[in-house]
A protein has these predicted regions:
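A polyanion-binding, active-site-adjacent surface
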Residues: 2-294
Length: 294
């Protein structure tokens, strides 16, 4: 893979990257080794009182109680697969909110699929995450909390901001944003997985119909797939690629229906692994270069 030339960043971009913890060209400082706290030792117990001459009577131990068997959960009967190929935004968001085509719907509060605040608004960038967490499920929005702040900073360093969506504090009559400076944010899965339930390939396949319709409506010129589930949803027709570790999937261009696709790490992963932020920044620049040369 060809090496990228040194990044040409102005002072504002460097300040933005420093704020989110990205050190361009410099390795991340090694994390300090936490000092293990000294073990607290208990004081010796006082000497036992004089032993009584007569032993206390021995009582039989009570028989262990047997827990009643847990009631079995009723089997989930999935509904029909979503048929959303021709839906407009209002119908698409309603279909996602009421979808019961897989068991991901069992514990959700909200889906994260929303229409742009301005009817017909498009965006040159589409950013796809993995699955909603608890806070995203509560708010009904993709990329919130610290991970959302990190992603917003990364996008801002490229002169981008997330597209305002309905139901997220934006009024429908808000002024449109230039598509070249906008990023539409979504997830591979629209529902938060129920507790103790990991997403399966079949779940991603069900939700892919929504993602493909979002792509058709947003009309992005470049797609950033952040995380394994995102890559699986966007590039499901490339199993050999998806079988490779993330380190080999990223750093190069892929295609979805002719649209450039760049795979990179999820912002949630980057919060736990700061040393990978510089690689993610290179991936964003790769996507920006692909868009500029399109």
């Amino acid at each position: 893979m060809p090496e990228h030339p040194p990044l040409q960043l102005d002072p504002r971009q460097r300040a933005m990257l420093a704020e989110m913890g990205v050190r361009v060209w410099l390795p991340e400082d090694a994390a300090p080794i936490p000092q293990e706290p000294a073990l607290a030792y208990a004081a010796p117990a006082p000497a036992a009182a004089q032993i009584a001459s007569k032993a206390a009577p021995v009582r039989a131990a009570p028989a262990p109680s047997v827990a009643a068997p847990a009631a079995s959960q009723p089997a989930f009967n999935p509904g029909p697969r979503p048929q959303v190929q021709t839906l407009d935004w209002p119908a698409l968001t309603q279909a996602a909110a009421t979808c019961q085509a897989c068991s991901m719907c069992q514990g959700r509060k909200n889906t994260v699929l929303h229409a742009p605040a301005v009817v017909g608004q498009t965006a040159d960038w589409l950013v796809v995450g993995e699955a909603p967490d608890e806070e995203e499920d509560r708010q009904g929005a993709a990329f919130v909390g610290d991970a959302g702040v990190l992603l917003d900073n990364m996008l801002a360093a490229l002169g981008l901001k997330r597209l305002a969506l309905q139901g997220q504090g934006a009024e429908p009559e808000s002024a449109p944003t230039e598509p070249a400076h906008s990023a539409y944010l979504s997830h591979a899965l629209q529902c938060r997985p129920p507790a103790g339930r990991s997403p399966q390939l079949a779940d991603v396949a069900v939700c892919r119909a929504y993602l493909e319709r979002e792509i058709a409506l947003v009309r992005p010129k470049v797609i950033l797939a952040m995380g394994r589930l995102a890559a699986l949803a966007v590039l499901s027709d490339q199993p050999a690629l998806l079988a490779q570790p993330m380190g080999k999937q990223r750093g190069t261009l892929h295609r979805f229906q002719g649209i450039p696709v760049v795979i990179t790490y999820s912002p949630y992963y980057l919060l736990r692994n700061s040393a990978e932020k510089a690689k993610a920044w290179l991936d964003l620049n790769l996507a920006a270069d692909a868009l500029a040369s399109a």
